[in-house]
Amino acid sequence: AGPYSFGL
């Protein structure tokens, strides 16, 4: 997870 919503 991070500042953007990808599949991370």
From Swiss-Prot:
The modification Leucine amide is found at residue 8. Disulfide bonds: none annotated. Keywords: Amidation, Neuropeptide, Secreted. Its main location: secreted. It is found in: Secreted. One of its GO terms (biological process) is neuropeptide signaling pathway. The keyword Secreted applies. GO terms for cellular component: extracellular region. Belongs to the allatostatin family. May act as a neurotransmitter or neuromodulator. This is Carcinustatin-15. It comes from Carcinus maenas (Common shore crab).
